[in-house]
Amino acid sequence: MIDRDKHQQLRIGLASPEQICAWSKRILPNGRIVGQVTKPYTLHYKTNEPEKDGSFCERIFGPIKSGVCACGNSRVIGNEKENSKFCEQCGVEFVDSRIRRYRMGYIELACPVVHVWYSKRLPSYIANLLAKPLKESEGPVYCDLFIARPIANKPTSLRSRGPFKYEIQSWRDIIPHYFSARGFGAFRHREIATGGDAIREQLAGLNLQILMDRSYMEWKRLGKQKSAGNGWGDRKIQRRKDFSVRRMKLAKHFLQTDIEPEWMVLCPLPVLPPELRPIVQLGGGELITSDPNELYRRVIYRNNTLTDLLARSRSTPGGLVICQKKLVQEAVDALLDNGIRGQPMRDSHDRPYKSFSDVIEGKEGRSRENLLGKRVDYSGRSVIVVGPSLPLHQCGLPREIAIELFQAFVIRGLIRRHFAPNLRAAKSIIRDKEPIVWEVLQGVMQGHPVSLNRAPTLHRLGIQAFQPILVEGRAIRLHPLVCGGFNADSDGDQMAVHVPLSLEAQAEARLLMFSHTNLLSPAIGDPISVPTQDMLLGLYILTVGNNQGIYGNRYHPYYSKYKIFSCKKPSFYSYDDALGAHWQKRIELDSPLWFRWGVGLRIITSVDREAPIEVQYESLGIFHEIYEHYRIGKNEVGEILSIYIRTTVGRIRFDREIEEAIQGFSRASEHPNKSLPAIII
């Protein structure tokens, strides 16, 4: 088993035949070697006990009951006084039955079998290494083509002929070139190969360093060629360059990982532990078996048949042996990836068997369903909605979710503050949802961040930390600017919330994962928290006016009914006065008004030196210069007394939000150790 304290990472790759045998072979104290599965049986039909040397054998995989052998004898596990650790009659070790979850077996194949993942899937690694088309590399795998053995790499006329099919006419054309048909059997065994033997010998004869150097030289030569002037020639050169790059990468990977190419051809076939492919007995005595058991059974049946044919090879026709090799290859293909070559193997109910590929890949496979998508404690899930009033670093957590996530902390708080004497009383208070519960919960959440995650997590910003606050409803609320990092929108997307428990996790969340510290894309450095279409539309509606300029809509029919608005617009001296009038519905969001501006503040217009439209004089010498978007009041000596700008309530509100945001960032930069204040962006 893998010790998580000793191993920090897990790498999946090819295993050598020696490694596969080392996983399974064991030497018993009496000197017998066990581990090889030779019989296609699983359980005895009368006793439901595992068959000896079958795919559920207790001698190979361990006892079904801890410390009990197949004979029924028992030993105390871990008792040093017991001399024998295995049964001398049946050969079963007295160990824990959990060993059947990870102890493996193996099947010694009568002929090498090519792993279908590396021959049939695109790109085909075997075809790339051998520099052959996919059909030509698959022909020898299923005994459809024969090739000459690479004996001392001599350029014989047979090798120069290329692959040929197993046909009577083909043999008749080849035999007269060499000798009579009397010694053709020995000649075929020595000079001609097919099946996994042929592919394995070709892969074993490769020099990866020379292959990589030649591919690099070819890529370099093709790169120097000028364009042919037609699309077909250029595409052909580009395909050849891509092929050279794939060969270089593949050869480099084999060299760096110390993996031999011939390991893509299986000689011993590993057998999964029986607990990973169980047989379940129903109430009526009926047995239900896993699909890999049936696929293993077919492999063992066909492999044993091939072994018998090879044992009496003198009396067995060569075509029968070749046909049986093809059946073994197809059985192993169905075990690894059923249906990859067309029609899958089916059971009696016409249902395709689930192979290893079906169990591993896909959304419901082992990786995504059981390893990556496992539910964990202190986590929840809900739909997300927009919370525009939230600061950038906060998220709204529903009360129902928050009380479940922080229940342990709330119980501790209730007991510490003497609101509950014990655990049962604290849970009763939480169940009744008394007001003190929400007070304690808010205190707990104030200093505890949470992590939000939206699947699929394609980059670092798929998980970010937030300061939670309690909200009503059942949906998680998020600031709209952080949705870009999650690639989320508010049309029904769901997000998971996790509570970091350890101090290290909380420190990481505060220092590295808070949303206000992840404003730039880690890939290209561009801003990722930018306004989207809905926010831009809202800003446009907030800042647009219903008319432009001082003369805009002067003769609109609406103002002809209300003369006071046609001649004089309301004036306000502060933000609060203007916003208060809007909340009292005296003016609309886009209604034009005069707003008092600071005398020392600059007025930015589209024209540098704008001439006044008109000048209005009063009796005391005070006059007003009226411009397109503002007016200036001056005394008789020309000193500025007042400035009013023409704006709307929406623009005043937008300006105030920007001002508060800038002040908030200024305070945060002056006190970097304090938490970020509530900023509305």
From Swiss-Prot:
Signal peptide: none annotated. Belongs to the RNA polymerase beta' chain family. RpoC1 subfamily. Gene3D superfamilies: 1.10.40.90, 2.40.40.20, RNA polymerase II, clamp domain, RNA polymerase Rpb1, domain 3. It is found in: Plastid, Chloroplast. It comes from the Eukaryota. Binds 1 Mg(2+) ion per subunit. DNA-dependent RNA polymerase catalyzes the transcription of DNA into RNA using the four ribonucleoside triphosphates as substrates. It comes from Cycas taitungensis. One of its GO terms (molecular function) is DNA binding. Keywords: Chloroplast, DNA-directed RNA polymerase, Magnesium, Metal-binding, Nucleotidyltransferase, Plastid, Transcription, Transferase, Zinc. HAMAP family: RNApol_bact_RpoC1. It catalyses: RNA(n) + a ribonucleoside 5'-triphosphate = RNA(n+1) + diphosphate. GO terms for biological process: DNA-templated transcription. One of its GO terms (cellular component) is mitochondrion. Its EC number is 2.7.7.6. This is DNA-directed RNA polymerase subunit beta'.
